[in-house]
């Protein structure tokens, strides 16, 4: 996993609440275990029309959304089933962070495990960003994980919460197993100093 420190990039707004994981990536894409290529299924039912051509009205298909690395969406993002393919697809598409007023717990957890940063913002901040994006679809944001802040287009900074363990793992580019392996020497030393009684029963 690549370390996550500061993310500066173009944002795109998908102003929909309660986007579930089936809308993020349909079930037929879940047979694969390789993350690469999952971008093709991201928001597939919305990105494409019945004849398979791109839907020009879908926010991600608009020219101004090209190269966006930050997705802004409505509350309860990632609800529904626990499929880990949802954050995989978002990351494979090129997103490094998702901003929303709230996230489904399992989606949030799955995202943190792969280095996709879920940033919880106040509803008022979300509403402001939606309005700003409508006026300037080239809107850029900066997310600083170390200070847990999002720098808005006008320079103001807003704070976002994240637990200490997830923050450490993201900053150092390690997953849960990687963190455990970092503690290997300490674990071995502890076990050596705490011998377990042996029973023959």
Curated annotation (Swiss-Prot):
GO terms for biological process: L-leucine biosynthetic process. It catalyses: (2R,3S)-3-isopropylmalate = (2S)-2-isopropylmalate. It holds the Pfam family Aconitase_C. GO terms for cellular component: 3-isopropylmalate dehydratase complex. One of its GO terms (molecular function) is 3-isopropylmalate dehydratase activity. Pathway: Amino-acid biosynthesis; L-leucine biosynthesis; L-leucine from 3-methyl-2-oxobutanoate: step 2/4. It comes from the Bacteria. Its EC number is 4.2.1.33. Keywords: Amino-acid biosynthesis, Branched-chain amino acid biosynthesis, Leucine biosynthesis, Lyase. Heterodimer of LeuC and LeuD. Catalyzes the isomerization between 2-isopropylmalate and 3-isopropylmalate, via the formation of 2-isopropylmaleate. NCBIfam families: leuD (TIGR00171), PRK01641.1 (NF002458). Belongs to the LeuD family. LeuD type 1 subfamily. This is 3-isopropylmalate dehydratase small subunit. It comes from Chloroflexus aurantiacus (strain ATCC 29366 / DSM 635 / J-10-fl). The gene is leuD.
